[in-house]
């Protein structure tokens, strides 16, 4: 970890994918006037937390304990200390909003890693996560 105090927008990989799929559907039906524009599919503002808090959540939901290793050396990389994205346009234009809160996001990610580490069946695990996500089958 370069800087555990930096704040980032954490999201489940299927969240933006669902946004892009909805956008493609709207474009195919000519419901978007100008398709040459940029789109953000961002998590909820509550999902923007410091890296250290994310590590704490991973430790909460992961059966394996995560060891936090901080890189104390000065990085030459310029890095934003507070990274936040806005998906207001997606919300307003195509009625897309993220579904998962941060706890559920981290739990789903930890579940995926735990299952794939045990079964080594990445395809089946990923397919099940996709089905659950689009059927709105969540439990915390």
Task: Indicate residue ranges for each PLM-predicted region.
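Alpha-helical substrate-binding/gating segment
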Residues: 11-39, 60
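Generic structural signal for alpha-helix termini and adjacent loop/cap motifs
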Residues: 23-30, 93, 112-116
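Catalytic cores of nucleotide-enabled group-transfer and carboxylate-activating enzymes in metabolic
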Residues: 14, 25, 45, 105-107, ...
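Conserved C-terminal active-site "lid" loop/helix of NAD(P)H-dependent oxidoreductases
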Residues: 13, 38, 75-97, 118-121
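Amphipathic terminal alpha-helices
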Residues: 102-140
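Non-catalytic, hydrophobic alpha-helical segments
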Residues: 16, 20, 41, 51-54, ...
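C-terminal "lid/loop" region of Rossmann-like NAD(P)-dependent oxidoreductases
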Residues: 34-39, 49-55, 63-82, 122-130, ...
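Glycine-rich "substrate-gating" loop/helix at the edge of Rossmann-like oxidoreductase active sites
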Residues: 3-15, 43-47
